[in-house]
Amino acid sequence: MFLIYINDLPNASEFFNILFADDTSLLLNDRDIQKLQKRAEDELMKVEEWFATNKMHLNSKKTKYMLFNLPKSRTFTFELKLSGIELDRVSESGDEKSVKLVGITLDENLTFKHHVDKLKIKLNKVNFILARSRTFLPKKIRLLIYNSLAGSILEFGSILYGNATMSVLDPLIKLQKKLIRNVYGVPNGSHTNKAFAELKILKLPDLIERNKCVVAHKLWYETAPKNICQDFKPIHTTTYNTRVIDRLQFDVPLCRKAGLEIAPVFAVSKSWNRLDLTIKENSKSRNL
């Protein structure tokens, strides 16, 4: 009922709205920081008016904002006010360093470090269960525990947090190996290649790459939502194109700034372009 009640909120301002249960996130972007601040304040006033018209109150104490920027960019002076009250900013230098959006923990530089830290806490709990149970539970049951608990944790949001740097992902990769050793029943420090193969579990880097290609497959054959597909442009080729390498390839935009490679339009496109042409062609009429 609440979602029906606020269904026309996206029409009240220029903000891009993300409505999830009783949580609402408003997104706005601009190349000029001063223009962004002015636009954000103006649009917040429109949102506040919409709430008042619909007999609701926008609580400024519970409303926070985050300024997304590239790592190592210069610091900007940025303030937002609502009803004359300055809103709290979520940043690395503030009390709150991250915010959760639809299950993904975001920081202002999109390093996904805080998200990975939370994944490690969850996976360590699963590892504790597996370590304690490996002496009396059969391998089949331990594998079931891994797939239902740890596997689902690693899968969720992997095409986003999977674009983090290796220094951020490496502890997660090592933790997955600990989990696999406990599932397979081998001592700590043992090689895990055989265990991954026999258990039919993908290593984290391969899992991330696979999931990017699955998303890219939906984008290429336009089975994903149209508003997402339109951001991914294929390289235009003719039927008689002699450059086989250009067939079934996304046009990857030129990236002039370091850090932008984490955007799905870059990361997903590159994963698809790396995929073997035979796999792309054979998967046309079915799921990848």
Predicted feature locations:
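Short, charged alpha-helical motifs in flexible N/C-terminal segments and linkers
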Residues: 48-67, 100, 168-234
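Short, conserved catalytic/metal-binding micro-motifs enriched in Asp/Glu and His
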Residues: 1, 21-25, 51, 99-109, ...
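Catalytic palm subdomain of template-directed nucleic-acid polymerases
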Residues: 25-49, 70-71
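Amphipathic alpha-helical
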Residues: 226-267
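Hydrophobic packing residues in well-ordered alpha-helices of helical domains and bundles
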Residues: 37-40, 44, 58, 116, ...
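Basic, alpha-helical interaction scaffolds
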Residues: 14, 90-160
